[in-house]
From Swiss-Prot:
The gene is truB. One of its GO terms (biological process) is tRNA pseudouridine synthesis. GO terms for molecular function: RNA binding; tRNA pseudouridine(55) synthase activity. Signal peptide: none annotated. The keyword GTP-binding does not apply. It comes from Streptococcus pyogenes serotype M2 (strain MGAS10270). It catalyses: uridine(55) in tRNA = pseudouridine(55) in tRNA. This is tRNA pseudouridine synthase B.
């Protein structure tokens, strides 16, 4: 059995499920999952867990994400990104400066509330929102709280002859954030229709785009029996607090017994040497093995 983490660079036009399906065939391994869905048009880091590493995939999914993208001011779309149909146009504000954009972006920092876009996989009454949207139906969408730790402009404002304005941005955010919606809400705060015209995920669960592999690159390596793209399972718990345990504690964990440890964290990744051996959960002032990985 193959075990480990893959830092996959998902390409545009592919769903996250497509990527998993192709890797299952390529590696001849059924036990494969991904750590955080990317929309088909979005490129970038898609953490993949293989074999035993699938047991820690939930902790990769919960980790924060970093995205880089582009906002277009001047019109909005059905999907809130460039793939949708134009639904409204508006003239740019009489005063639109980099200082105004930067100041407005800071108002989105911290905890904010978002309404998921209709073209999303959020379920309402057992149906995904995009199913309602495709059927021409509307439904009340549940608002959700997310955290934005960074949201900044990374390029000059680019004004076009057709009364549009585009600029690049970078955002660091919590799980469940809709960056499309963030782009639309930013435009609304500036008094103009807008949409997200490009997006890539540059980091997720401690993995970065610079060290990611495309499916083509992985296929080429597999054909040469080269498996260096496979990272240790420890990468899957990189965002959890780490606790190093001794031999006695290792034995206790292997029998599923509770431990008294000097920590107040709700979850711990227990390491013995350089290897993660369990996920521990705080229960009544003690830590109970939630998942034993040895």
């Amino acid at each position: 059995m193959i075990n480990g983490i893959i830092n996959l660079k998902k390409e545009a036009g592919m769903t996250s499920h497509d990527a998993v399906f192709k890797l299952r065939k390529l590696l001849q391994e059924k036990k494969i999952g991904h750590g955080g869905t990317l929309d088909p048009d979005v490129v970038g880091v898609l953490p993949i867990a293989v074999g035993k590493a699938t047991r820690v995939i939930e902790y990769m999914t919960e980790a924060g994400k970093v995205y880089e993208g582009q906002v277009t001011l001047g019109y909005s779309t059905t999907t809130e990104d460039a793939s949708g149909e134009v639904v409204a146009r508006s003239s740019l504000p009489a005063v639109l400066t980099e200082e105004l954009v930067d100041q407005t972006m800071t108002t989105f920092l911290g905890k904010i509330t978002q309404t998921p876009p209709m073209y999303s996989a959020v379920k309402v009454n057992g149906r995904k929102l995009y199913e309602y949207a495709r059927a021409g139906e509307s439904v009340e969408r549940p608002r959700r709280e997310v955290t934005i730790s960074q949201f900044e402009r990374t390029s000059p404002l680019n004004f076009t002859e057709d009364d549009l304005c585009r600029f690049s941005f970078k955002v660091a955010c919590s799980k469940g954030t809709y960056v499309r919606t963030l782009a639309v809400d930013l435009g609304r705060a500036l008094g103009v229709e807008s949409h997200m015209s490009f997006l890539q995920r540059s980091a997720s669960a401690g993995l970065t785009l610079e060290t990611a592999y495309t499916l083509g690159e992985i296929a080429d390596m597999v054909s040469k029996q080269e498996m260096s793209f496979l990272l240790p399972i420890e990468y899957g718990v990189a965002d959890l607090p780490k606790m190093v345990i001794d031999d006695t504690e290792l034995t206790e964990i292997s029998f599923g017994r509770r431990l008294s440890l000097p920590s107040q964290e709700p979850l711990l990744a227990a390491f013995h040497g350089e290897k993660v051996i369990a996920i521990l959960e705080k229960r009544d002032q003690e830590y109970k093995p939630k998942k034993v990985l040895i």
